[in-house]
């Protein structure tokens, strides 16, 4: 039986399709939904002169990045509550490598299903880079739905 659904959003249209799918599933099974957005801090490389490539301060960059992720999460939560007011919805911002954080959140929270969007990388990119959805499907111990 499905009681707890974890859905990851990144602001892309595919992730919002995944959100809508998760909400439909939650409504059908009277399940709750946790929406997560994963903030992965990028490596800021330095050049040989030891100057940051990013022209602003590192703190300002991180603050902007965090704000963008918080806005994405708030938009997803608002959309979920608007579309399915009867579904219990919570939202959390996590930090780290996306696939690992999604899987760990599902494990710790005892989630029955993880729903993620398909990124839609080209075939060659998928071979070399893989994707978050593929890594989640590989690592997760619960059911994973990848929405196209």
Residue positions per predicted region:
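Conserved N-terminal glycine/acidic-rich loop preference
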Residues: 19, 51-52, 68-73, 98, ...
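General small-molecule cofactor/ligand-binding pocket signal
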Residues: 36, 90-94, 145
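Structural beta-alpha unit
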Residues: 75-114
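Short, hinge-like loop/turn segments at secondary-structure boundaries
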Residues: 50-54, 107-109, 132-133
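Glycine-rich, Arg-bearing micro-motifs that act as flexible, cationic patches
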Residues: 113-135
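Small/aliphatic-rich secondary-structure junction motif
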Residues: 3-56, 84, 88
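A short acidic, glycine-rich active-site loop
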Residues: 55-71
